[in-house]
């Protein structure tokens, strides 16, 4: 069959609800690619730590590595890629989709929202925000394909950055084929 099934789980959801589905996929030999988004936090409920982060509410604890959990369940094909290495991530997903059976791509990068909040609390300079330069030719790749809510369209079709939504991680910069997205330094303490 040419049909491919792809699903996504965050690292927190993997631990609290995803493991039975993985066991089911393995047991039934599903042709299924799972992408685990490992950012080290439970963002949807307030940035609590997850078992793979090495911390709990009391402080440091022994990590429970996602890869080891998956291997323990019997997953044979696992790719681990830094989410910000977009070419490598794309390659890993394409390789996984080309194979039969159940396989997992672990897309890893710390949560930048949590990072910027911690940085701000410490009074350090925040990561740079981004701005759109005159090199923008309104291809709108940053809006339509990258999908960051920071990017907004004006009625005339030009793109602007809603700075209070920008976390400054720079992951968007390679998406513009014209190089119109550039960094802009922010002072310490300014809201990310």
Q: Which residues does each PLM region occupy?
A:
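Thiamine diphosphate
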Residues: 1-106, 112-119
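N-terminal export/assembly segments and adjacent metallocofactor-ligating motifs
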Residues: 4-5, 31, 77-78, 174, ...
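A broadly tuned "polar low-complexity/structure-edge" signature
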Residues: 46, 130-132, 186
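Short, contiguous acidic/charged loop-to-helix segments that flank catalytic cores in large enzymes
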Residues: 55-58, 127-138, 163-167
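Iron-sulfur cluster-binding cysteine motifs and their immediate structural context
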Residues: 115-116, 137-162, 167, 171-189
């Amino acid at each position: 069959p040419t049909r491919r099934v792809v699903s996504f789980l965050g690292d927190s959801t993997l631990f609290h609800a995803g493991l039975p589905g993985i066991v089911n996929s393995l047991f039934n030999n599903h042709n299924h690619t799972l992408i685990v988004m490992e950012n080290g936090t439970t963002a949807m409920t307030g940035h609590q730590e997850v078992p793979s982060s090495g911390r709990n509410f009391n402080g440091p604890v022994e990590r429970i590595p996602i890869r080891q959990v998956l291997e323990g369940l019997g997953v044979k094909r696992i790719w681990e890629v830094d989410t910000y290495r977009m070419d490598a991530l794309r390659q890993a997903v394409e390789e996984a989709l080309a194979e039969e059976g159940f396989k997992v791509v672990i897309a890893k990068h710390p949560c930048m929202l949590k990072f910027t909040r911690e940085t701000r609390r410490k009074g350090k300079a925040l990561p740079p925000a981004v701005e759109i330069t005159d090199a923008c030719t309104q291809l709108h790749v940053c809006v339509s394909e990258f999908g960051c809510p920071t990017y907004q369209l004006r009625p005339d079709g030009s793109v602007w950055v809603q700075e209070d939504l920008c976390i400054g991680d720079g992951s968007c910069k390679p998406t513009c084929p014209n190089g119109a997205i550039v960094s802009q330094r922010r002072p310490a303490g300014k809201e990310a």
